[in-house]
């Protein structure tokens, strides 16, 4: 096991900066997930750690060793890719044993390691099969098993579930999380899927345009996003954003959301007269027919554009009289349809405020 640190790490391809001044400490035994849209720098960061790309500036350490100049084979890591890269002419056993054979390990030690990993992953009965005889989920387990037998200090996983269907992905998420718990080894995982990130990571590093936006626990990312990007990226459906304006009413500073007057929070008042964006998560917008007991309600009149029945909830797409569109997640018992005029209710205790120009959160 080992900790990992990125210290002012930059990776530049000609004029394109893929990773920009990344500073990140990953604890020994932690499950850290890099998440972000395509091209954000998450996979490049993993490849820099693996030694598949060279660092332009800064340094990467595994434990107390600087690894910038070390080849991948000398970094004591194991990597699982999106494409499982199994040798088609080899059996499962031979695929899992291959790296140990190259290292010249004794046959009995290889057998013990392979059988132990196979038992851990529930693939003991597949050891004699070839990859073409396996399902996608089974191939994924073999690829993970091949990494386990090496007993690395750090596991690196680059979108390993992308090739699985939805049901298998749920199962594989649970298996990888359990594997991390059983092995107590550092896992660094890359995905564009926020569900994978939220359900698997001890902490999540959110990236955009090569820059680390926020690294925190799943709960803190969701409840205390550092900026507009994180707020909009984490959560499905995404957070709604409204432009709010300042006004004076009866000698007091207020805010206006499409004509609906709101009190001015102290934190916002301290921010001066800078332009504001208000964030409201879809689950904090309610139909008046079904309201939770403890909220500070505010009416938000709107016209319904579309309703999606999800079974346990309704996803409602609506639009205010001023033309601002938003999404609400409401009780499925509500009888609501397209073109209905509804006075939705929002919980003002669950508002998020952002500096519109700086895009940073105001707490």
From Swiss-Prot:
What's the name of its gene? ggtA
The molecule here is called: Osmoprotective compounds uptake ATP-binding protein GgtA
Location(s), subcellular: Cell membrane
Its Enzyme Commission number(s) read: 7.5.2.-
Q: What interactions and quaternary structure are annotated? A: The complex is composed of two ATP-binding proteins (GgtA), two transmembrane proteins (GgtC and GgtD) and a solute-binding protein (GgtB).
Query: What GO cellular-component annotations does this UniProt entry give?
Result: ATP-binding cassette (ABC) transporter complex, substrate-binding subunit-containing
Q: Which organism is it from?
A: Synechocystis sp. (strain ATCC 27184 / PCC 6803 / Kazusa)
Q: Where is the ABC transporter domain?
A: 4-234
Protein's membrane topology: Peripheral membrane protein
Q: Which PANTHER family match?
A: MALTODEXTRIN IMPORT ATP-BINDING PROTEIN MSMX (PTHR43875), OSMOPROTECTIVE COMPOUNDS UPTAKE ATP-BINDING PROTEIN GGTA (PTHR43875:SF1)
Keywords from the UniProt entry: ATP-binding, Cell membrane, Membrane, Nucleotide-binding, Sugar transport, Translocase, Transport
EC supergroup of this enzyme: translocase
| InterPro entries in the record | AAA+_ATPase, ABC_transporter-like_ATP-bd, ABC_transporter-like_CS, ABC_transpr_MalK-like, ABC_transpr_MalK/UgpC-like, Mo/tungstate-bd_C_term_dom, NA-bd_OB-fold, OB_MalK-like
